[in-house]
């Protein structure tokens, strides 16, 4: 989300990896496409609800709560896939999400653009979205303005969970399954780098959906270029770490 509560992203990669594995496992077991997609999104929603409960009700610091659930999700994913990659074949109605094209445009690109457009409108032009943004940017100031910050934090966690759950499903379709890697740290560093690099597009340093999307495409292109030139994933993470630091400094 376009706020500076970056600690909320701690478990993003782990949740995407979990729902990706879940969708792959269900499809391998013969579950319907609709059930696999719904299950992935539902698990994302559940994790968002758990994070919200830990932060809002139990009052565990955000960083600690999301870090804890990240480790739990990594453990669940390792147990679920038994440390093995889950590979699926092309499945009508599912593979089209990650591999399909309309003319020369990838379907997954259109899905991402559509979701981002909806989020941009939501955060910029709706009362609920603006209040969620204000709560994430400065909870204390939002409270002083009379906003029900607990309500908007809950909505933020739930919406984040839904989006990350769906992202895992898309990743499963795009990669024809799920890898055995459960850390999710690559996804985390990319998400943080895109969010903070996107803030450089604003004169006030404001994080935004559009800036994040543009930065995300830049980071994806950069990562692919580095891979083509023989750079390892570990080295790419180092490069993205430098980009993250520079983005914050800017």
What are these regions (language model features)?
Residues 31-69, 114, 215:
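Alpha-helical transmembrane segments within multi-pass membrane transporters and channels
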Residues 58, 62-125, 152-155, 174-180, ...:
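Transmembrane helix-bundle core of multi-pass membrane transporters
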Residues 7, 29-30, 57-59, 203-206, ...:
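Helix-loop interface residues and adjacent transmembrane-helix termini in multi-pass membrane transporters
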Residues 1-6:
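Short, small-residue-biased leader/transition segments that mark boundaries at the very start
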Residues 20, 70, 74-75, 109-120, ...:
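Hydrophobic core segments of alpha-helical transmembrane domains in multi-pass membrane transport
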Residues 9, 117, 137, 143-151, ...:
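Cytosolic-side transmembrane-helix boundaries in multi-pass membrane proteins
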Residues 164, 175, 179-238:
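Transmembrane alpha-helical segments in multi-pass inner-membrane proteins
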Residues 118-158:
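Membrane-helix/interface signature in polytopic inner-membrane proteins
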């Amino acid at each position: 989300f376009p706020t500076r509560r970056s600690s909320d992203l701690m478990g993003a990669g782990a949740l995407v990896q979990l729902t990706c594995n879940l969708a792959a496992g269900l499809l391998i077991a013969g579950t319907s496409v609709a059930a696999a997609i719904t299950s992935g999104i539902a698990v994302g929603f559940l994790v968002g609800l758990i994070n919200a409960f830990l932060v809002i009700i139990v009052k565990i610091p955000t960083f600690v709560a999301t870090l804890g659930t990240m480790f739990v999700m990594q453990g669940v994913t390792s147990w679920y896939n038994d440390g093995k990659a889950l590979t699926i074949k092309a499945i009508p109605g599912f593979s089209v999400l990650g591999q399909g094209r309309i003319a020369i445009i990838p379907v997954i690109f259109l899905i991402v653009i559509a979701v981002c457009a909806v989020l941009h409108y939501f955060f910029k032009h709706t009362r609920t979205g603006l209040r969620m943004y204000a709560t994430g940017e400065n909870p204390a100031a939002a409270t002083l303005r009379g906003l029900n910050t607990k309500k908007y934090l809950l909505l933020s966690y739930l919406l984040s969970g839904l989006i990350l759950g769906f992202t895992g499903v898309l990743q499963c379709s795009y990669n024809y399954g799920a890898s055995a890697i459960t850390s999710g740290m690559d996804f985390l560093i990319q998400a943080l780098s895109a969010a903070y690099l996107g803030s450089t597009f604003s004169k006030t340093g404001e994080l935004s959906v559009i800036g994040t999307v543009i930065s995300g495409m830049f980071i994806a292109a950069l990562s692919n270029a580095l891979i083509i030139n023989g750079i390892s994933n570990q080295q790419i993470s180092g490069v993205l770490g430098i980009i993250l630091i520079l983005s914050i400094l800017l």
